[in-house]
Amino acid sequence: MPFKMSRAAYASMFGPTTGDKVRLADTELFIEVEKDFTHYGDEVKFGGGKVIRDGMGQSQATRVDGAVDTVITNALIVDHWGIVKADIGLKDGRIVAIGKAGNPDTQPGVNIIVGPGTEAIAGEGKIVTAGGMDSHIHFICPQQIEEALMSGLTCMLGGGTGPAHGTLATTCTPGPWHIARMIEAADAFPMNLAFAGKGNASLPGALEEMVLGGACALKLHEDWGTTPGAVDCCLSVADDYDVQVMIHTDTLNESGFVEDSIGAIKGRTIHAFHTEGAGGGHAPDIIKICGQPNVIPSSTNPTRPYTINTLAEHLDMLMVCHHLSPSIPEDIAFAESRIRKETIAAEDILHDIGAFSIISSDSQAMGRVGEVAIRTWQTADKMKRQRGRLPSETGENDNMRVKRYIAKYTINPAIAHGLSHEIGSIEIGKRADLVIWNPAFFGVKPDMVLLGGSIAAAPMGDPNASIPTPQPVHYRHMFGAYGKARTNSSVTFVSQASLDVGLAARLGVSKQLLAVKNTRGGISKASMIHNSLTPHIEVDPETYEVRADGELLTCEPATVLPMAQRYFLF
């Protein structure tokens, strides 16, 4: 006679199973388990009197025989491809299997072999996501990296050299000398890092030397002069060397309007930063570019989501970040031209329908590096409350909306920047850059962050206590963040061209240098998973009202948000 358990008892012991629903933090977002890859009655679980013991759930297999290095048991995976319950097997710092873990000598259907050399991470009742990627980083201070890691980010792409005024305003590392220093500095950090060179030039020579010097992308920024000539030149170099181009267009419309920038792009693939415009770009209608099939549009998180405080904080932020003076009327006019409640409200809806593809931070330069996940899920929650369930949802859940929003800071930036063969999702063969969450703290405070299969960060109690949990509990680096484990657990992404000319040997860095690939004609807006809509966008030049395919896009600002003061004292 099979043993029967109530759903509540089963979920308490092994985590939710098919058909069970889980609330994400304090939002109105509810996910439903679509499939359970574990086997009822043969689940593996670690602990006293539990299954993963010698001769039971643990086999005699050696590592050579196929035993994994780490098993995450009974995890609820939330990814762009599905919301499923499964065990996850990690080996050599990569995901090698998703399915049923255990001992094949005593259990059927095992595709993840647990052996004496296998570590166990208890995933029961936990959510596992791919590590987040922030593709809009101003490398103003190295302390950003710890902040990002502790929030669940495992890859940061952008530019800068520290608190130089060029870096305070623009996301680029100018010149091969600075790029080399940043790649060397990357060895010190438990984080996958990637650096963009400056893309503003009318002749290719200086851009080519940056790509050959290790830049994995080129950034066009209006503060360096984003003219049609610079746009064309930069994209031509990118096409030759297979690196992505990110663009921040001309707010003042000095060298042309949005149509001129679209013309200069000539249908080539490009990542458009803060496409709404508050972060910069042709005023007031840069948002129109999100309807172009070759443009990958993204947001930075200060405008995510639209709240009663959004407009008020932006003016001061903008004055500081772009080296403007409140005593110069032209500087104030420049700042005010970028801040429009109508386009910010429309941005919420464009994210919800999948027309904006990526959310990033704009770290310390009109953005908060530790709030990429929080702002993403706050936007999703606001849209559910204001717009209801997505028409594409099936069942009494928010699975489709959750898949759409998690893709915005995991797989889609990875695809856009040529990293998706390594990171961005929980798939076999990819790096084991994973984040484990308690559902009540989902998107806010991770339980554990893994880099290349090693635990790099986690909340930890008093090190002198008799158990790990006594106060003060706060985030601390773990062993994966120290010594050679740090440089063996994370990587630096560069151009293939730089590797071909011997960059690794020339710099002698400890981290592995990996090449970006397929950033040009092989991808487009259509490549953005769950976020590929290309509506025709119109902006009224006087009222700033935004329409998509003729429909007015507007919503009220939020007065209260989830994932906020309930979780933070400060």
UniProtKB/Swiss-Prot annotation:
This is Urease subunit alpha. Belongs to the metallo-dependent hydrolases superfamily. Urease alpha subunit family. InterPro entries: Amidohydro-rel, Metal-dep_hydrolase_composite, Metal_Hydrolase, Urease_alpha_N_dom, Urease_alpha_subunit, Urease_AS, Urease_asu, Urease_asu_c. The active site is at H322. Keywords: Cytoplasm, Hydrolase, Metal-binding, Nickel. Its main location: cytoplasm. Its cofactor is Ni cation. Ni(2+) 1 binds at H136, H138, K219, D362. Residues 131-570 form the Urease domain. HAMAP family: Urease_alpha. Ni(2+) 2 binds at K219, H248, H274. NCBIfam families: PRK13206.1, PRK13207.1, urease_alph. It is found in: Cytoplasm. It comes from the Bacteria. Gene3D superfamilies: Metal-dependent hydrolases, Urease, subunit C, domain 1.
